[in-house]
Design a protein with these regions (language model features):
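Short amphipathic alpha-helices and their capping/turn segments at secondary-structure boundaries
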Residues: 1-5, 57-73, 118-133, 217-230
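N-terminal binding-site loop/beta-alpha segment at the start of enzyme catalytic domains
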Residues: 1-92
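Short, well-ordered coil/turn segments that N-cap beta-strands
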Residues: 7-11, 41-43, 68-72, 131-135, ...
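Conserved, mostly hydrophobic/aromatic
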Residues: 13, 30, 45, 60, ...
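Active-site mouth loops of central-metabolism enzymes
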Residues: 16-28, 103-119, 150-154
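Short, acidic/polar
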Residues: 24-37, 114-128, 184-192
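Beta/alpha (TIM)-barrel catalytic core signal, keyed to glycine-rich beta->alpha loops juxtaposed to Asp/Glu
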Residues: 29, 139-337
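Active-site gating/metal-coordination segments in enzymes
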Residues: 87-135
Length: 337
């Protein structure tokens, strides 16, 4: 099923912050954030067992428990099982994401992309989310940022396990769509080139943004559009760097990134627009993009995101970005064509 048809609106909600990403978020604040998203009209919520070792899914399930199930769409991820046993979270080996979720639940997380583990993961997520169905399942993080030189072996495990399981679940009507949920372009390229598999789309985080988009633009977006698939873009603010935060790719931003942000902001200020408007509207200008899912850990962020989509961004802003070499000249922008 096309993600463009399945997803209810262009703005969704990424729940990673609700897993206590970077900080310990009080329950009341987490609930207020989900309520703000719902009251704003957002009806697509992306989750993952990895986010706080199930914490984000639990919070989302509690917040949506009294909402009509046919009114919203849920995606979650497979590839990580959350066990009942606990562990020292500081001892976890989580690749580039390091201690991002050190304030989450202490339950042990194991990487497992096998067929049986995929079925178990879906069942576990259904329980945490307090729902009877999940519309979209993403295979999570089969990429270099987590597995280094072993990523191809993990991808092969997913090819023979998770991909087959999700194909079956979709054919049986348990889910409506599946694909990869990754922070790198290469796994998507690889899956698109495989025969015999029929993904419905992809969740690509941090790789189609104002700050980093060239490889995705050249290698993924055209194929996705040609096949009638869709991309959900996560991390449109590049871990917060685009909107003045200190991090890029879950780590302190480099001087080069900070300089690029400053140059973009100079142009945005000149035209009287917010950096959020620039970031979100750039992403959604690509016809392959079905939705964008900024993460939010505070209620006020929801209103900011919605307002950013409504801002009028002058065409001269995009032209000046291109002329300054701050975006790829081939990247679609609002008003093209």
């Amino acid at each position: 099923m096309s993600l463009h048809d399945l997803l209810p609106g262009k703005l969704g909600f990424g729940t990673a912050p609700l897993g206590n990403m970077f900080r310990d978020i009080p329950e009341a604040e987490a609930r207020a954030t989900v309520d703000a998203a719902w009251n704003d009209g957002i009806r697509y919520f992306d989750n993952a067992p990895f986010y706080g070792a199930g914490l984000a899914e639990i919070r989302m399930g509690d917040a949506l428990a009294d909402k009509p199930r046919d009114a919203y769409v849920i995606s979650t991820k497979v590839g990580r099982l959350v066990l009942d046993e606990v562990e020292d979270v500081s001892a976890r080996d989580l690749g580039e994401k390091g201690e991002v979720f050190k304030y989450g639940r202490p339950n042990r997380i194991v990487n497992d992309y096998s067929y049986d583990a995929t079925l178990r993961s879906i069942d576990d997520s259904l329980a945490r989310l307090k729902t009877d169905r999940i519309e979209i399942a993403w295979v999570h993080d089969v990429a270099q940022d987590f597995y280094g030189d072993e990523w191809l072996a993990m991808f092969e495990s997913a090819r023979t396990g998770a991909f087959r399981a999700l194909d079956r679940l979709r054919d049986e009507g348990v889910i409506k769509a599946w694909g990869l949920g990754v922070n790198r372009v290469e796994p998507i390229e690889l899956l698109l080139d495989l025969e015999g598999l029929r993904p419905d789309g992809f969740l690509l985080a941090g790789r189609y943004t104002l700050l980093d988009h060239s490889r995705a633009l050249q290698r993924v977006m055209p194929k996705v559009a040609e096949r009638g698939l869709g991309i959900v873009v996560g991390g449109p603010y590049s871990s917060g760097a685009l909107v003045g935060g200190p991090n890029f790719e879950y780590a302190p931003a480099t001087p080069a990134i900070l300089d690029k942000v400053a140059r973009i902001k100079t142009l945005a200020d000149r035209h009287g627009i917010s950096m959020k408007a620039a970031g979100l509207q750039f992403v959604l200008a690509n016809p392959a993009v079905a939705a964008v899912i900024p993460g939010a850990s505070r209620p006020e962020r929801i209103a900011e995101d919605r307002a950013a989509l409504r801002e009028t961004v002058p065409t001269d802003f995009w032209r000046e970005l291109r002329e300054a070499g701050l975006i790829d000249r081939q990247a679609p922008v609002p008003g093209d064509g």
